[in-house]
Amino acid sequence: MRIMVDTNVLFSALLFESVNMNIIFNEIAMNHKLVVCSYVIDELQGVTKEKFPAKIAVVEKMLSKMSYELVYTPKIIDESLFEIRDIKDYPILYTAVIEDVDILISGDNDFFDEKLEVEKPLILRPREFRDMFVL
């Protein structure tokens, strides 16, 4: 399966020691295809620069060593595909939809709002992904 992660999941995986994130990313690397969109990369770099400026080089190095499919998030997007509470999350889900990814992993509550309706991808929290796919 093609599995996309949002900014907070990638941020947690790269900057914090987490057994759960290590397990999740190992599962993806071994059995699936990790997908990262350009919007997430840009957002990750911005958040790192703002909150952890000393870690910018670490993030850059890790991103360059990771194996993933990089997909482009268009600058001009169709804003009528779905409604999401936080408009800043729209480009991430939009990219997941147009790139036909199977699963989007996010810890952001806006992706789990009951009003959000998308047929695909399946949106899971990190723990849900682990419980469903890690044996």
Give a label for each model feature.
Residues N109-L135:
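Acidic, PIN/NYN-like endoribonuclease modules and their adjacent C-terminal/linker elements
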Residues V9-L10, V40, I92, D110-F111:
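Alpha-helix capping/helix-boundary segments
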Residues E69-L104, N109:
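Active-site neighborhoods of divalent-metal-dependent phosphate/nucleic-acid chemistry enzymes
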Residues N26, T95, K115:
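Hydrophobic/aromatic ligand-binding patch that stacks against planar heteroaromatic rings
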Residues D6-T7, C37, G107-D108, R125:
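A secondary-structure boundary/capping signal
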Residues D42-I76, I92:
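Domain-scale selection of a single, long terminal region
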Residues M1-R2:
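Residues that mark the start of a beta-strand
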Residues V5, L15, M21-K49:
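PIN/NYN-family metal-dependent endoribonuclease catalytic core
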